[in-house]
Amino acid sequence: MTQTAVELWQELACPRDHSRLEPRGETLVCEHDHEYPFVEGIPVMVVDDEIPPTQPGYWAKPEQIERVRAAEPPPVEGEAVDPYVAELILGTHGNLYKDLSGGMPRYPIPDFPVPRGNGELLLDIGCNWGRWTIAAARSGYRPIGIDPSFEAVVAARRIARQLGVDDARYVVADARKLPFADDTFDVVFSYGVLQHFSKSDVALSVVDIRRVLKRGGYSWVQMPNALGALNLVRLGQRRFREGDEFEVRYWKPSELKRVFGRIGPTELSTDGFFTLNPQKRDLDLLPARFRAIVQVSEALKRAHAPTTLADSVNIRSVAA
């Protein structure tokens, strides 16, 4: 491992005990001898011996890493879309995008929903192929994307390079055991990710989000509101059970304020109605029947429909 590579990752810390890391060959090692491999420039910082995965089979074990390395496709050229994005589009973007699983004319990269940055360090939790990480970089931030899937992180780096996004960096890591030093980030962002966690795992993630945020920094997390019309229908369809594995968990606004309030002062705002991924920038990619959902959602936002009735809400918490 080159010294230049190590210097790029000065923000990293042991996800188990938060101690500093030092290079040792092709690994990073903490003062308690916990080791983490550096694979082709990507730190692999998961701790699957301490906590079970949030989704079965979603870890970066050595045999999985080797399979990914052996099968990684060549970078696509020009404006073509990496096949990985189409393959995962339903899981990463939701039902409105299901018709794009066979391919799409461009990358569905959204407008970044927080105020434009000026070089602030931002953590994108659950980046997958990097749509929000890329959006953050284009909006003036220095983003680091994390995901527990080595395959996803490799794809994210490949796509960022294709698009000429040089400021994005990626780490294989878990939201509940963030591999960063205390007081590192100006902003912690997550969209469409923590909604798949159990409520106890969200609480664990919130503790670590607060730890890695600088005082006065803030988190911006999208979550589903249990009082939204679409979400009530979906809850009824599964007989109001909590959900398991990668199913969406639905939260009441009071629950969200209580849990995320552990970071600091917390406010909820409307993300959208009748969908958990209302991206108006992607209207040209959607069929008419789904485009109408996003357009209605935008109209309700302009009319200041109550946030308490939105299906998707944003939670902004300032680190106290």
PLM region descriptions:
Residues 189:
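A conserved beta-strand element that flanks and buttresses the S-adenosyl-L-methionine
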Residues 238-255:
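Acceptor-substrate binding/catalytic loop of class I
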Residues 2-78:
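N-terminal auxiliary segments of SAM/dcSAM-dependent transferases
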Residues 203-215:
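A short glycine-rich, Lys/Arg-flanked "PGG" loop and its adjoining helix->strand segment in the class I
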Residues 3-9, 20, 234-239, 268-320:
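A C-terminal cap/extension of S-adenosyl-L-methionine-dependent methyltransferases
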Residues 46-117, 135, 219-242:
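Conserved class I S-adenosyl-L-methionine
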Residues 123, 129-177:
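Class I SAM-dependent methyltransferase SAM/SAH-binding core
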